[in-house]
From Swiss-Prot:
UniProt function note: Necessary for normal cell division and for the maintenance of normal septation.
NCBIfam families, A to Z: GTPase_YsxC (TIGR03598)
Pfam families, per the entry: MMR_HSR1
UniProt-annotated binding residues for Mg(2+): S37, T59
Domain EngB-type G: 22-195
Cofactor(s) the protein needs: Mg(2+)
GO CC terms in record: cytosol
Entry's family note: Belongs to the TRAFAC class TrmE-Era-EngA-EngB-Septin-like GTPase superfamily. EngB GTPase family.
GO molecular function: GTP binding; metal ion binding
Name of the featured protein: Probable GTP-binding protein EngB
Gene Ontology biological process terms, A to Z: division septum assembly
HAMAP family: GTPase_EngB
Length: 198
């Protein structure tokens, strides 16, 4: 998809702050510093739309981006950062649970994982959470450029088996450096939005 317009609309922490819109929404989740911001910037053809932080756990709000006046991307705060206090972690949990369980505009989620490593307990928990609430999920296995091409399938198998990926959920090999998987990611996103609104 050709992105001609991408703007941040609002940073929200509670439902009354969410955009008053019927446009489909795609939530983007992932561990702190997994490369989620780089993924968003790459797929939207923007270098600095989403700030890439060297400090894990920096995003503490749901950031809504309006794409081509057609849909919203919702950047969810990164999880799994050990130095976040229990109070902050609990607040984060409540915020995302409220969004995922009440937002009718939500069509699907994108879960960004690092292809180089086995998904963590937090990755598994996040995927299970999405499945518990029956949210269609696209898994973006990023940093593919850091692994020899001949080992991609082996690493994909580990991701698939560790998360126990359900039938219907797609896994897309991705690289923010080379742009690998960009078209496939957009195809998967369109499929999810069309499927739900068909």
């Amino acid at each position: 998809m050709k992105v001609t317009k991408a703007d941040i609309v609002i940073s929200a922490v509670k439902p009354e702050q969410y955009p008053d819109s019927d446009l489909p929404e795609i939530a983007l989740a992932g561990r702190s510093n997994v490369g989620k911001s780089s993924f968003i910037n790459k797929i939207l053809n923007r270098k600095k739309l989403v700030r890439i932080s060297s400090k894990p756990g920096k995003t503490q709000t749901l950031n809504f981006f309006l794409i081509n006046e057609m849909m919203h991307f919702v950047d969810v705060p990164g999880y799994g950062y050990a130095k976040v206090s229990k109070t902050e972690r609990a607040a984060w949990g409540r915020m995302i649970e409220t969004y995922f369980t009440t937002r009718t505009q939500l069509d699907a989620a994108v879960l960004v994982v690092d292809l180089r490593h086995q998904p963590t307990k937090d990755d598994i928990m996040m995927y299970d959470f999405l499945k518990h609430y029956e949210i269609p999920t696209i898994i973006i296995a990023t940093k593919a450029d850091k692994i020899p091409k001949g080992k991609w399938q082996k690493h994909l198998k580990v991701v698939k088996e560790t998360l126990a990926v359900e039938i219907g959920d797609e896994i897309v090999l991705f690289s923010s450096e080379t742009g690998l998987g960009k078209e496939e990611a957009w195809k998967a996103i369109h499929k999810m939005t069309k499927t739900k609104n068909a």
